[in-house]
């Protein structure tokens, strides 16, 4: 493990990185939130279907 090389790599990445603008942050947040809601809704549908079918699920 070459510590000076690793530190230089990390510093180079941090220099290139920038904080997102407010619009960019809101767009990413909305997309991530929509994805979380979609996965939750799919899970709920699966649970509901499994609960309604006789002999399947709990």
From Swiss-Prot:
Keyword RNA-binding applies: no
Membrane topology: Single-pass membrane protein
CC terms in the record's Gene Ontology section: plasma membrane
Subcellular location: Cell membrane
Keywords: Cell membrane, Membrane, Protein transport, Translocation, Transmembrane, Transmembrane helix, Transport
Annotated GO MF terms: protein transmembrane transporter activity
UniProt keyword Ligase present: no
Transmembrane annotation, as ranges: 36-56
GO biological process: intracellular protein transmembrane transport; protein secretion; protein targeting
Self-association and partners: Component of the Sec protein translocase complex. Heterotrimer consisting of SecY (alpha), SecG (beta) and SecE (gamma) subunits. The heterotrimers can form oligomers, although 1 heterotrimer is thought to be able to translocate proteins. Interacts with the ribosome. May interact with SecDF, and other proteins may be involved.
Known function: Essential subunit of the Sec protein translocation channel SecYEG. Clamps together the 2 halves of SecY. May contact the channel plug during translocation.
Family stated for the protein in its record: Belongs to the SecE/SEC61-gamma family.
Listed name of the protein: Protein translocase subunit SecE
Upper taxonomic lineage: Archaea, Methanobacteriati, Methanobacteriota, Stenosarchaea group, Halobacteria
């Amino acid at each position: 493990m070459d510590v000076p090389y690793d530190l230089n790599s990390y510093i180079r990445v941090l220099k290139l990185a920038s904080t997102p603008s407010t619009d960019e942050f809101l767009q990413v947040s909305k997309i991530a939130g929509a994805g979380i809601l979609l996965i939750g809704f799919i899970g709920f549908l699966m649970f509901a279907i499994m609960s309604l079918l006789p002999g399947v699920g709990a």
